[in-house]
């Protein structure tokens, strides 16, 4: 075994955590040559359930899984980690305002940011999954000033996968034939799934799909509202598909991107495409396996700019609501 990675997962006994841990342990995230240690963080009352998950992980006898531990002590869970997968957050409840949700989770992610800075390995990278993930990542990052800003990501990969599937189904092709799908902005109902730069079998999606009214209307709204549609159908939020997107996102970060393609995740803005510096904003990204860069130079037309500005403004509003938590 040539490499080993220590991974912290918060909210490990929850539905996303349950769907995620076995895939990390099997090697799907970091590849067949990388051993894994899992350090799980859970609330005290969820420790028994997390121990049950560990029993199942043991019973899988994964060759790549060297060790699993669970703790309600954040310093223990984050000690010497190379990756922090921040899955756990407080979900929005009936009657709760967005500002309330931001502040409740803000306290959690303030603590987690400080603990990452204090305990993690010097090469730590962080993917925030718990919603509202862009602003949760912003809060954690600003409370861990010693961790470089290019190590922080929030997940828009589920939106990318949803968009790819919608385009593939409309075009009558396989999802593997769809590439270059960018999700701009916030992981929320304001996100902008960009079909103008997307490709189907290497051709512009707008050439392959002639129904441009669908692209500008139902395509965007379906992707934006897919999470709510799943809750309505299933009675619970996306879990397996979210876990799958976590695997995809980390794999895309640590693996060289196919030439000419990109993947979507939110990261720290340095002003690219006119976005406020310091926001955690959804961009198209490419990786050389070590360093991740924002794909620049893409055209955003007047239609796209209108959508782009809506999601940009929402993220600025969220930042303003939590400004007292930004270190």
UniProtKB/Swiss-Prot annotation:
It is an enzyme of class 1 (oxidoreductase). Its EC number is 1.1.1.37. The keyword NAD applies. It catalyses: (S)-malate + NAD(+) = oxaloacetate + NADH + H(+). GO terms for biological process: malate metabolic process; tricarboxylic acid cycle. HAMAP family: Malate_dehydrog_2. Belongs to the LDH/MDH superfamily. MDH type 2 family. This is Malate dehydrogenase. It comes from Leptospira biflexa serovar Patoc (strain Patoc 1 / ATCC 23582 / Paris).
């Amino acid at each position: 075994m040539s490499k080993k990675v220590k991974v912290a997962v918060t909210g490990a006994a929850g539905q996303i955590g349950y769907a995620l841990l076995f895939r990390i342990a099997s090697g799907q995230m970091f590849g067949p040559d990388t051993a894994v240690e899992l350090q799980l963080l859970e609330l005290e009352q969820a420790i028994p359930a997390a121990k049950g998950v560990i029993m199942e992980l043991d019973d899988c006898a994964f060759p790549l899984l060297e060790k699993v531990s669970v703790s309600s002590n954040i310093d223990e869970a984050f000690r010497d980690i190379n990756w922090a997968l921040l899955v756990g957050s407080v979900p929005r409840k009936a009657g709760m305002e967005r500002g309330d949700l931001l502040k409740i989770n803000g306290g959690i992610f303030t603590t987690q940011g400080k603990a990452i800075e204090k305990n993690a390995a010097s090469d730590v990278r962080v993917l925030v999954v718990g919603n509202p993930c862009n602003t949760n990542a912003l809060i954690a990052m600003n409370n861990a000033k010693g961790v470089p800003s290019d190590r922080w990501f929030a997940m828009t990969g589920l939106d990318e996968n949803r968009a790819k599937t919608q385009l593939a189904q409309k075009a009558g092709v396989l999802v593997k034939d769809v590439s270059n799908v960018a999700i701009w902005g916030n992981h929320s109902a304001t996100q902008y799934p960009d079909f103008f730069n997307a490709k189907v079998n290497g051709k512009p999606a707008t050439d392959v799909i002639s129904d441009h009214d669908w692209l500008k209307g139902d395509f965007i709204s379906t992707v934006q509202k897919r999470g709510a549609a799943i809750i309505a159908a299933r009675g619970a939020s996306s879990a397996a598909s979210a876990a799958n997107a976590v695997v995809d996102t980390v794999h895309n970060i640590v693996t060289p991107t196919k030439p000419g393609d990109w993947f979507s995740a939110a990261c720290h803005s340095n002003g690219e495409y006119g976005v406020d510096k310091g926001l955690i904003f959804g961009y198209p990204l490419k990786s050389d396996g070590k360093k991740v860069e924002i794909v620049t130079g893409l055209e955003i037309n007047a239609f796209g700019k209108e959508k782009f500005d809506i999601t940009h403004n929402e993220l600025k509003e969220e930042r303003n609501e939590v400004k007292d938590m930004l270190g």
